[in-house]
Amino acid sequence: MARREEETKEFEERVVTINRVAKVVKGGRRFRFTALVVVGDKNGRVGFGTGKAQEVPEAIKKAVEAAKKDLVVVPRVEGTTPHTITGQYGSGSVFMKPAAPGTGVIAGGPVRAVLELAGITDILSKSLGSNTPINMVRATINGLQNLKNAEDVAKLRGKSVEELYN
């Protein structure tokens, strides 16, 4: 039991959306709840998950478990992203641009949750296209996955970091 308590303290979780869905059967409608949750340690690891259940707390619990299974490591430079990136999923895209220290997280709804839990403190972002919460979260995580540090790029090119900037 103590191990589970430690595990939950490691990650902060944020519920992005809860949706009531209905299945129409012969006797009427059967309602269930879906939950979209983002988890992160505010230190470069973030993930999202969805859960569906008869009750809201149960759906959230399932979503948190799913989110912890699929974490992404986000490269950061002084609290922001190393470079400008656009993440895409479906018809939704999220444009993210590094910002100067003190700017804060300029992002809307689901995108803000992902960026804050990833530990990014200064960033400018704009959501384009589809604004469905799940698509926004997936597009944001897609963009964060495609980020590269200067060290990684230098290694891929077989050069030193100093040579990249000259």
From Swiss-Prot:
Listed A to Z, the keywords are:
Ribonucleoprotein, Ribosomal protein, RNA-binding, rRNA-binding
For the keyword Ribosomal protein, the answer is: yes
- InterPro entries for the chain: Ribosomal_Su5_D2-typ_SF, Ribosomal_uS5, Ribosomal_uS5_bac-type, Ribosomal_uS5_C, Ribosomal_uS5_N, Ribosomal_uS5_N_CS, Ribsml_uS5_D2-typ_fold_subgr
| Record GO terms (molecular function) | rRNA binding; structural constituent of ribosome
Residues covered by the S5 DRBM domain: 11-74
One GO biological-process annotation of the entry reads: translation
Pfam families, per the entry: Ribosomal_S5, Ribosomal_S5_C
Q: Which GO terms describe its cellular component?
A: small ribosomal subunit
Give the domain section of the comments: The N-terminal domain interacts with the head of the 30S subunit; the C-terminal domain interacts with the body and contacts protein S4. The interaction surface between S4 and S5 is involved in control of translational fidelity.
Protein purpose:
With S4 and S12 plays an important role in translational accuracy. Located at the back of the 30S subunit body where it stabilizes the conformation of the head with respect to the body.
Q: Quaternary state and partners of this protein? A: Part of the 30S ribosomal subunit. Contacts proteins S4 and S8.
Recorded family membership: Belongs to the universal ribosomal protein uS5 family.
The cross-references to HAMAP family, in alphabetical order and at most eight, read: Ribosomal_uS5_B
Q: Write down what this protein is called.
A: Small ribosomal subunit protein uS5
Species per Swiss-Prot/TrEMBL record:
Staphylococcus epidermidis (strain ATCC 35984 / DSM 28319 / BCRC 17069 / CCUG 31568 / BM 3577 / RP62A)
**Top-level taxonomy:** Bacteria, Bacillati, Bacillota, Bacilli, Bacillales
Gene name tied to this protein: rpsE
